[in-house]
Amino acid sequence: MNTLVLKIDAILSKHLKKQLAPYTISSQNTYVAFAAKKNGVTVLLYKSGKLVLQGNGANALAQELNLPVAKTVFEASNNSQDIPIIGSDEVGNGSYFGGIAVVASFVDPKDHSFLKKLGVDDSKKLSDKTIQQIAPLLEKQIPHQSLLLSPKKYNELVGKSKPYNAISIKVALHNQAIFLLLQKGIQPKQIVIDAFTSQSNYEKHLKKEKNHFPNPLTFQEKAESHYLAVAVSSIIARNLFLDNLDQLGQDLGYQLPSGAGSASDKVASQLLAAYGMSSLEYSAKLHFANTHKAQALLTK
């Protein structure tokens, strides 16, 4: 997906709005003055005068609209690594046991040599042992913001008749991690989130969050394979999740598995038999189907 970021004046802004009037869409971002979507390309005009075009046809649409395409900034590939980037990723949302770890990291081009020497890559391709070795080095060298939502807090916030669902809670965590990192004086040229929902859905849930920032976002599937900043966040988040999972297991006297398969059902049923539902409230995400499966195992 291509992302173009331009700075346009009031005259060009007025002309742009007129051209794209038939393609207007709503945006929940309070910093966006005008939004449209044409030919699969999302167009966001910010109150600051910054214009963002996102989509595979961004360059073609920019030419059609007579925009200054010479100011093209980014393309979601390794060619975009020559700019300072914040990348955000989460780990744990698909695991029954353990919390959710979200990390936003700032990677400058000067960090690339260090990261390549460490072998930083998509954390999903790395063993847990390697991640646990690399993560402390990244935490020391790379500016980042880590957030961990414990299972207990997750269960208070997520579920039927509760403030969040499984998607909106991740929106809140990503937004807060990036916001706090920006508060440290970080000045990225691009902010990339490993896409877990559509941009429109993200912005819908973002509306109810207290903290906001004006920087445009790039949503990229499997972003950890395209951006070093996201790969760094993925590694740090994975390590944070594993540490939390291990600590929860030590507290309960059980080895808690990652994931949401039959192994989780079995351990959950053992916890229910030993300690009751309070043990799962403390260590697991209750709305997962594993809870009912574990209860069913007790009756056999």
UniProtKB/Swiss-Prot annotation:
Span of the signal peptide: none
Protein role: Endonuclease that specifically degrades the RNA of RNA-DNA hybrids.
Cofactor note: Manganese or magnesium. Binds 1 divalent metal ion per monomer in the absence of substrate. May bind a second metal ion after substrate binding.
Gene Ontology terms: cellular component: cytoplasm; ribonuclease H2 complex
Protein name: Ribonuclease HIII
Catalysed reaction, written as an equation: Endonucleolytic cleavage to 5'-phosphomonoester
Gene name, Swiss-Prot/TrEMBL: rnhC
Native organism taxonomy: Bacteria, Bacillati, Bacillota, Bacilli, Lactobacillales
Compartments (UniProt record): Cytoplasm
Record-annotated disulphide pairs: none
Superkingdom, taxonomy of origin: Bacteria
KW Metal-binding (keyword) present: yes
Organism of origin: Streptococcus pyogenes serotype M1
GO BP: DNA replication, removal of RNA primer; mismatch repair
Residue intervals of the RNase H type-2 domain: 83-300
Binding site for a divalent metal cation: D89, E90, D194
A molecular-function term among this protein's GO annotations: RNA binding
